[in-house]
Amino acid sequence: MWQALYEELGDKGFVPISVALDESPDAARPYIEKANPQHPSLIDTEHVVAHRYGLINVPAVIWIDEAGKIVRPSTAEYGTDQFVQFHGRESGPFLDAVRAWVNTGEVRTDEAVPSHMPAPTDDEEVARAEWALAWFLHQQGKTEAAAQHFARAGELSPDDWTIRRGSMPIQGQNPMGPEFFELFKDWEARGKTTHATMAAEREN
């Protein structure tokens, strides 16, 4: 999808940068090679992008203009309607919004687009530090200690799927298996927090 948009809009200055949050380059490489993108496609094993841009789930899209300014904060968006019955967000309006932004400068929003990027809470900051420590310990082969810190990170930031679901494959769990569905049930019970609802809550 991104390659198709790049081919369509690239001559107007549009450059998508895709970033995979995966535990190793090998985990993401097959998908990147299959897509054969001509635009930058990165693999972030340290979750730097998630931490710096406040991502709590993927796929998420951030619009950044030529001056380096964020003009549309992190929003859950989808390039196809393959899983629309699961998440309920159609791809068409998003793709049209990208085209409008590139062609006219119009930044379209809707109820799913946060009004701003809220600063992380103290617990969320600690959660990210816990995740980083867990990942370091895991790479050192200290899996039991790592598991404790992964769990603590999830407790401190329970609505952050990049932490909770992102640690599943690292720990040998299936991110689409039973653990994922338990996470989904917990997320539903907690009110289905999204980037937009989080931003709205912190405005008050």
What are these regions (language model features)?
Residues 1-34, 45-46:
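Structural microenvironment flanking redox-active thiols in thiol-disulfide oxidoreductases
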Residues 29-58, 62-64:
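Short, internal strand/loop/helix patches
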Residues 65-142, 171:
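Thiol-/selenol-based redox modules, centered on thioredoxin-like
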Residues 124, 157-158:
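Short coil turns that delineate tetratricopeptide repeat
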Residues 170-198:
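Alpha-helical linker/edge segments of TPR/alpha-solenoid repeat scaffolds
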